[in-house]
Every structure is written in C-alpha cells, then in structure tokens.
Amino acid sequence: MKPNIHPAYRTVVFHDTSANEYFKVGSTIKTEREIELEGVTYPYVTIEVSSKSHPYYTGKQKTFDNEGSAARFQKRFGNFIGAKRG
C-alpha cells in the first residue's frame, strides 16, 4: 500500500440526537467537532437515526393495512378492462 494516501482510521463518537444515545465506532469520517466521553476526547458526529431510534429496530414500527396500488386500480377500473366492446 502507498503511504500517506489512506484516511486516518480512528475511534469516533456518533450521537443519535433523537434517542440521545452515544456510540463509539471506528471510522474514517472527517469532522472538526470533538467531545469528551469517559475522560477521553474523541471526534464527534451527530446523526438523526440509528438502531436505537429507528422504528424497525425499536419495535415501534407503524403498520399500515392499506391495499396495494395495483389492487386499488383493479377495484376502480377492473370492469373497464374486462368489458367487451361492441
């Protein structure tokens, strides 16, 4: 590998603002912000959605019992398609 062409890999703190959770993850993301966590200063990045706040992972997912668009089309216009012209 060529020296000095790869981004610096380091531990970064990601802050899920909607769940107010902090994650320490190895990353090459560039950021100017820093945060002190557990007595150590880390690069800091805010995110809006993570596994702690996304409905799929939290189990608070909304389910919709709507029929699909193809079924709605058949319901509205099914008679026109099958009707004989004449």
Swiss-Prot record:
A single GO cellular-component term on record: ribonucleoprotein complex
Molecular function per GO: structural constituent of ribosome
HAMAP family, per database record: Ribosomal_bL31_2
Complex and partners: Part of the 50S ribosomal subunit.
A GO biological-process term: translation
InterPro entries (UniProt xref): Ribosomal_bL28/bL31-like_sf, Ribosomal_bL31, Ribosomal_bL31_B, Ribosomal_bL31_sf
Gene that this sequence comes from: rpmE2
Species of the source: Citrobacter koseri (strain ATCC BAA-895 / CDC 4225-83 / SGSC4696)
SUPFAM superfamilies, sorted: L28p-like
Protein name per its UniProtKB record: Large ribosomal subunit protein bL31B
This protein's UniProt keywords: Ribonucleoprotein, Ribosomal protein
Similarity remark: Belongs to the bacterial ribosomal protein bL31 family. Type B subfamily.
One Pfam family recorded for the sequence: Ribosomal_L31
